[in-house]
Regions:
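CoA-thioester-processing core
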Residues: 1-49, 62, 77, 81
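Short acidic-aromatic low-complexity motifs
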Residues: 4, 50-52, 126-130
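C-terminal long alpha-helix characteristic of the crotonase
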Residues: 9-14, 56, 65-113, 120-121, ...
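Hydrophobic alpha-helical segments typical of transmembrane helices
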Residues: 31-34, 43, 55, 95, ...
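Short alpha-helical scaffolding segments that buttress acidic/His motifs in well-ordered protein cores
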Residues: 47-51, 96-100, 135
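Acidic, divalent-metal-coordinating active-site segment for phosphoryl/phosphodiester hydrolysis
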Residues: 52-58
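Terminal low-complexity tails and localization/encapsulation signals of metabolic enzymes
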Residues: 133-144
Length: 144
C-alpha cells in the first residue's frame, strides 16, 4: 500500500516488497502501475519479476520513499512533515495534487493547460489573497 500514498516516510529498518510472483499471482492494488512511475519501467520489472526485498535505503535511493529516519524518530518526522504541509493553503494543496495526478500521464502541452486552469482557479480565493498579503507584509500566511 505504500505506493498509494502521496509522501512516503519510513524507518531505517523498514523492508518493502512486491512478493506476488513468489506466490504464483500478479501484483495487485495497482502496484504494477504505480511502481514504474516511481522507479522506471526496467527497474520496476526487476523488482516485480524477482520478488526482491528492498531495504529502506534501497527504496529511498530508487525514489520509492521520500525520507528514511531512525525508528525512534519516525513519528516526529511524520508530524513535522504533516505540520509543514498543514501550514499551507489546503485548497491550493488539493488543487496541486489534482493537477499533478491528472497531468502526470498527459502530453506536456496538455499538462501545461491543466496547470494554467488550476492556477487561474486560485486567484481571488481567500487563501490566495491571504498568501499574497502575507508575502507583501513579510509575515507567515494564516490560512483557514
Amino acid at each position: 500500500f505504500v505506493l498509494c500514498t502521496d509522501i512516503r516516510i519510513a524507518n531505517s529498518k523498514a523492508k518493502l516488497r512486491l512478493p506476488e510472483v513468489t506466490l504464483g499471482i500478479t501484483p495487485g492494488f495497482n502496484g504494477s502501475q504505480r511502481l514504474p512511475k516511481c522507479v522506471g519501467m526496467s527497474k520496476a520489472k526487476e523488482i516485480i519479476f524477482t520478488g526482491k526485498m528492498l531495504t529502506a535505503a534501497d527504496a529511498l535511493e530508487l525514489g520509492i520513499l521520500n525520507k528514511v529516519t531512525e525508528p525512534e524518530n519516525l513519528m516526529d518526522e511524520v508530524y513535522a512533515m504533516a505540520n509543514q504541509i498543514a501550514d499551507n493553503s489546503a485548497s491550493a494543496i488539493a488543487m496541486a495534487k489534482a493537477m499533478i495526478n491528472v497531468g502526470a500521464d498527459m502530453d506536456i502541452d496538455i499538462g501545461k493547460n491543466i496547470e494554467l486552469g488550476y492556477m487561474a482557479a486560485c486567484f481571488g480565493t481567500p487563501d490566495q489573497i491571504e498568501g499574497f498579503t502575507a508575502f507583501k507584509e513579510k509575515r507567515a500566511a494564516k490560512f483557514r
